[in-house]
């Protein structure tokens, strides 16, 4: 089979690494594989194509804020992508996360449908079925059609116009009639349950596939790494704003309450002026093996996000033999191994502190057993095998 993946980035950030793992796995298995990505550094790797330079994506991001249409524009790059697909003639096109202002999603879906192209759509966020925001949180409008958005600046970053209703209609029109040639692949049961409530995607076939990681060379248990009795939080962005969806404010408050525990934060962070002395920022850790060592040294990992469609930190932590404690955020409490993790209602610091202290002092765990169980569940090989099955079913249907 020949598979063509499309993603925002390649070889970096969570979806870029997933795309790379899948690409390499397909090649190792004897399949043909091509990756087209929209943003980020140029990669000198065969069968990997960057669609446009970063300035093009930034320009289209700016235009989308003016027009209020988050997934439109990008006419030249969309035509270029269509030419690549025609030239490569793949058996299956796999759309990963494509909300990076490098392709017109409405036009691309409509074109793939018209071509009767066998297509897999991975749901790494909610925008494919909300047609607007990446996380809808408690809003329910996306189910039947967005009207007046009460959170317009965050939902699609529009500066002037509320065109959420138009975006929703365009996305619904693009997907309508594509059910026979397209399979939707959410990354978690939680995301699948949400997508099935949407008028845009509810009539499609679904196959949930967990995100996979490199459990052979990076994320695994190593008893040679000494435990440092720290609590690790891995995040895309740490902020001390209470309303920030990644929940940094709650971790600051928790660290104040647990002054006898050392907390480490890995990820980009705002300039936090007043922070507890027992909380330390490591910055963004790009080297995955270094990150894995921090997981192994930690006594526990902590998740404080308000909403997640998956949770790579949960998976990475468990594969390194480290239990997970956190807030209920949608997917994490569903995809995490229950016997090695615990989640409490979002925002309840009392319950979070109690749970974390129990895992640090009272619960007896075998970290190698945790890692072995997790590696079987979350390996990249498991993910690759699942997608090969999906591709095969589509290409012969």
Regions inferred by a protein language model and the residue ranges of each:
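Nucleotide-activated donor-binding/catalytic signature segment of Leloir-type glycosyltransferases, i.e.
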Residues: 267-292
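Short alpha-helical donor nucleotide-sugar binding micro-motif in glycosyltransferases
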Residues: 293-298
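Aromatic "clamp/platform" in nucleotide-sugar-dependent glycosyltransferases that forms part
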Residues: 306
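Short hydrophobic beta-strand element within catalytic cores of glycosyltransferases
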Residues: 323-326
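Conserved acidic donor-binding segment of nucleotide-sugar-dependent glycosyltransferases
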Residues: 338-349, 358-364
């Amino acid at each position: 089979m020949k598979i063509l993946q499309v993603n925002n980035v390649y070889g970096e950030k969570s979806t870029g690494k997933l795309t790379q793992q899948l690409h390499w796995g397909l090649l190792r298995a004897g399949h043909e594989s091509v990756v087209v990505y929209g943003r980020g550094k140029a990669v000198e790797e065969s069968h990997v194509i960057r669609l446009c330079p970063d300035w093009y994506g930034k320009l289209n991001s700016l235009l989308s804020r003016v027009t209020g249409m988050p997934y439109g524009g990008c006419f030249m790059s969309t035509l270029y992508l269509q030419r690549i697909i025609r030239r490569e003639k793949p058996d299956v096109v796999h759309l990963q996360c494509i909300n990076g202002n490098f392709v017109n999603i409405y036009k691309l879906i409509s074109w793939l449908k018209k071509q009767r192209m066998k297509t897999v759509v991975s749901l790494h966020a909610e925008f494919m079925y909300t047609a607007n925001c990446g996380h809808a949180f408690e809003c329910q409008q996306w189910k039947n059609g967005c009207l007046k958005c009460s959170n317009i600046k965050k939902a699609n970053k529009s500066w002037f116009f509320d065109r959420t209703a138009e975006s929703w209609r365009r996305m619904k029109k693009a997907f309508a009639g594509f059910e026979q040639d397209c399979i939707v692949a959410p990354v978690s049961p939680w995301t699948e349950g949400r997508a099935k409530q949407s008028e845009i995607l509810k009539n499609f076939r679904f196959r949930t596939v967990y995100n996979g990681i490199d459990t052979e060379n990076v994320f695994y248990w190593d008893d040679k790494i000494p435990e440092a009795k720290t609590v690790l939080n891995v995040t895309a962005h740490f902020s001390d704003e209470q309303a920030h969806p990644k929940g940094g404010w709650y971790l600051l408050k928790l660290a104040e309450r647990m002054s006898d525990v050392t907390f480490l934060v890995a990820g980009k962070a705002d300039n936090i002026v007043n922070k507890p002395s027992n909380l330390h920022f490591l910055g963004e850790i790009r080297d995955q093996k270094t990150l894995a060592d921090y997981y192994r040294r930690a006594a526990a990992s902590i998740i404080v996000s308000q909403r997640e469609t998956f949770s790579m930190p949960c998976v990475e932590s468990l594969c390194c033999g480290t239990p997970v404690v956190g807030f209920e955020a949608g997917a994490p409490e569903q995809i995490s191994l229950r016997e090695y993790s615990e989640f409490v209602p979002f925002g309840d610091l009392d319950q979070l502190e109690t749970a974390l202290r129990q895992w640090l002092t009272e619960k007896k765990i075998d970290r190698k057993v945790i890692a072995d169980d997790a590696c079987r569940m979350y390996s990249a090989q498991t993910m690759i095998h699942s997608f090969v099955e999906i591709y095969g079913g589509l290409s012969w249907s």
